[in-house]
């Protein structure tokens, strides 16, 4: 499974995730920090990446909008807001457990929550 971190996810999640073998790209790396939420999800969808965010309300709504307009995406994982930088390892562990449960294939329109 391939992941895309939006601009609100701590960059340590990227660093730790990669060190543990996850295929992760951040919005910072591809110069997408200024994109709107729909554009972030469009980017992730176009690249077959499951988007990871802390922006629960907007991305739940966007997932429904994409589904109702037949615009597939590779899923959205929502992590808790207000995590400290020290929580990045717990977030990555939750992502690894998620991949173990779900397998390596993304699920169109999936919106799920990770506990870290």
Locations of regions flagged by a protein language model:
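Short, basic, glycine/proline-bearing loop/turn elements
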Residues: 20-29
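Acidic, metal-binding active-site segment of PIN/NYN-like and related structure-specific nucleases
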Residues: 37, 43-62
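Acidic, PIN/NYN-like endoribonuclease modules and their adjacent C-terminal/linker elements
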Residues: 1-7, 11, 16-19, 32, ...
């Amino acid at each position: 499974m391939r992941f895309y971190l939006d601009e609100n996810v701590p960059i340590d999640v990227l660093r730790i995730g990669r060190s543990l073998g996850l295929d992760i790209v951040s919005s910072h790396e591809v110069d997408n920090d200024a994109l709107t939420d729909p554009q972030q999800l469009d980017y992730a969808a176009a690249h077959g990446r499951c988007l990871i965010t802390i922006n629960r309300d907007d991305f739940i709504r966007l997932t429904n909008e994409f589904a109702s307009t037949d615009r597939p995406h590779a899923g959205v994982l929502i992590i808790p807001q207000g995590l400290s930088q020290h929580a990045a390892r717990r977030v990555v562990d939750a992502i690894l457990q998620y991949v173990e449960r779900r397998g390596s294939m993304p699920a169109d329109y999936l919106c799920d929550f990770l506990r870290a």
